[in-house]
Amino acid sequence: MKALRNYLDKIKPNFEEGGKFHAFRSVFDGFETFLFVPNATSKSGTHIHDSIDSKRIMSMVVIALVPALLFGMYNVGYQHFHATGAAGGFWEMFIYGFLAVLPKIIVSYVVGLGIEFVVAQWKKEEIQEGFLVSGILIPMIVPVDCPLWILAVATAFSVIFAKEVFGGTGMNVFNVALITRAFLFFAYPTKMSGDAVWVSGDSIFGLGQSVDGLTVATPLGAAATSGAVPEFSWDMVTGLIPGSIGETSVIAIALGAILLLWTGIASWKTMFSVFVGLSLIHI
């Protein structure tokens, strides 16, 4: 890390006022503060110096999402192999899911961060770190069959109109990931609901098999259609059920929640209020 620090210090003058790459100062600052804690200090007032800044907080949230993301990748492969009847072991299922989910993560970050870089350059401000979390949340809350171009349009819409128009990270009144989901649901309802969007029916690099017209209902979808609550299954807890990429596993999500509580990033009061509010709605 010392060698990397020395290299950044060496090229930093090129991005400062008068340097040949001054126009890209915001981009450089964004990468530098992502890798290292800024050494800036306040000139007045009483402040507490803490090594945990907003980028570190966002990074910890991303780490907390990893269990649900990894399980979601496996579940994408599991649902495909299970629905198509194709033979495959754990690694075949995981690799299939990884290849199906990775393009969505790339599109989300490229579009969202691209817009934030452009806005930061235009406003001559530092790169804001809020999209570190939104960029991973967006692909986790959409069906695996959501087309990439639709995901790109929805991501661009939410970053611009739900975040940047309000001033950026910390000043937006809406959650970017949830606005993306809402935009997709109302603008492209056939790609976000029904029984044909939860399981991938395509073969990826020779893994799995292509099947036309593959339909699989989620437990809640089946309950809404039949009017009967599905019989309890531990698959609903472990997450081996159809659904959006990162939403199915209670265990994986709970692991992330425990990490956030243990590190002090999240409050149990906030989490508890979600369940209380949901319960009151159904009274």
Predicted region positions:
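N-terminal signal-anchor module of multipass membrane proteins
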Residues: 1-105
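C-terminal ends of transmembrane helices
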Residues: 42-48, 112-123, 160-170, 255-263
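Alpha-helical transmembrane segments in multi-pass membrane proteins
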Residues: 60-68, 104-116, 131-135, 139, ...
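Structural signature of hydrophobic alpha-helical transmembrane segments
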Residues: 95-108, 145-153, 241-249
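Generic transmembrane alpha-helix motif of multi-pass integral membrane proteins
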Residues: 116, 134-144, 254-260
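Membrane-interface helix-loop-helix junctions at boundaries between adjacent transmembrane segments
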Residues: 126-205
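Long hydrophobic alpha-helical segments that form multi-pass transmembrane helix bundles
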Residues: 170-254
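Conserved small/polar residues in nucleotide/adenosyl-binding loops
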Residues: 281-283
